[in-house]
Design a protein with these regions (language model features):
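Internal, hydrophobic cores of structured domains that mediate oligomerization or house catalytic pockets
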Residues: 88-215
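C-terminal interaction module
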Residues: 2-88, 208-345
Length: 345
């Protein structure tokens, strides 16, 4: 049985403006409309994510397998996925047409490298489908999602450039189906993905970035260090860096070889809660405990296995990602930096 982790559901109001034109006395007049609605701004989920230093045409088979594995895992939950985006920011209701579009992105195509675009066309490479992406999600706040975004293909890719695949499950899914079900899903998704790094573990799915919601979430994230709030994407240029410490930590080349492989990890990790499992293709997964844990610092539950792995991986961890806040919000930057090092200090 999974541990009794806390529920986190933060409700709030979202405001945004849309623009259009209205004909008044024969003239088109620009109109600004304000939209206001309530939604869940933060909720607890299990997040699975992989950082893939490869172009789309090398990933198609693995991404299709990961998607099919996810769909099988959530079978029996009608409405879990009800909307989608595909190679465009606007979302649509998920119909057979939507599935056709997503499957089309996973059909092999002749790669076109970014260098092959004429200068006047290069800025439209994303719209041309050079970096295919799609997202599947359910009604707001239900915790189900699947997302894939390929990197732009270069003949010599910039080192930080990666494609990213991620999925989330509500924690209720973990409780209903059990830890083994979620563990097997993460392992099955990983099995055909040539990842550099990746993880599976507890996270807070945020509508707004953490620095805009710190007042709402401060108590939760400092009390429960097992909740991740860093939602890295392909825009962040993760390269081969490790994005924090989680329940299941997937490592591939070059980080794994620099740590001495699975044998080197076993020799340096001594927590009884830690297991190191070798995978095909010079990869491994480090699992911290039988189930994901949020921890509770008020009860002395500081997650020592997480802290031990953090010390080992510190040279390979992603640098603090919110340093730009130092000028406009130094207090927020300082607090988030303290959270970022919660397993190191």
């Amino acid at each position: 049985m999974p541990p009794n982790n806390p529920r986190v559901r933060i409700q709030g109001t979202v405001r945004y403006e849309s623009y259009g034109f209205e004909e008044i006395e024969g003239k088109l007049v620009k109109k600004v409309r304000e939209h206001v609605y309530d939604r869940i701004l933060a909720r607890d989920v299990v997040r699975i994510i992989f950082f893939l230093p490869h172009d789309h045409h090398h990933l198609i088979t693995g991404v299709a397998h990961a998607l099919d594995s996810y769909l099988r895992a959530i079978d029996g939950h009608p409405g879990a996925l009800s909307e989608y985006t595909c190679c465009w920011w606007e979302s649509f209701k998920l119909t057979e047409t939507g599935w056709d579009r997503i499957r089309e992105t996973l059909e092999p195509k002749k790669p076109r490298f970014f260098e092959d675009y004429e200068p006047h066309d290069a800025r439209f490479a994303e719209k041309d489908g050079a970096d295919p992406y799609f997202t599947l999600f359910g009604e707001q706040g239900n915790g189900y999602s699947f997302k894939y975004h390929a990197r732009l293909p270069w003949r010599e890719p910039p080192p930080p450039s990666v494609s990213v695949l991620s999925a989330t499950l509500p924690t209720e899914h973990l409780e209903e189906h059990g830890v083994q079900h979620v563990r097997e899903l993460a392992m099955t998704m990983a099995s055909r993905l040539p990842f550099a790094t990746g993880h599976a573990g507890l996270a807070l799915d945020l509508w707004h970035p953490i620095y805009d919601q710190l007042d709402r979430l401060r108590t939760e994230i400092f009390r429960h260090p097992g909740f991740d709030v860093r939602k890295a994407s392909h825009f962040d240029g993760m390269g081969t860096r490790v994005d924090g410490i989680h329940w299941m930590n997937f490592l591939g080349p070059p980080v794994l070889s620099e740590l001495g492989g699975a044998a080197g990890l076993r020799a340096r990790l001594h927590s009884p809660a830690t297991s190191v499992q070798e995978l095909e293709g010079e990869r491994t997964v480090i699992t911290l405990g039988d189930a994901p844990e949020a921890g509770d610092t008020t009860q002395g539950q500081t997650l020592p296995a997480y802290r031990e792995l953090a010390r080992l991986l510190e040279p390979h961890l992603e640098p603090f990602p919110w340093g730009y806040l130092a000028r406009k919000s130094p207090e927020v930057e300082e607090e988030l930096r303290r959270w970022w090092r919660r397993f190191l200090d």
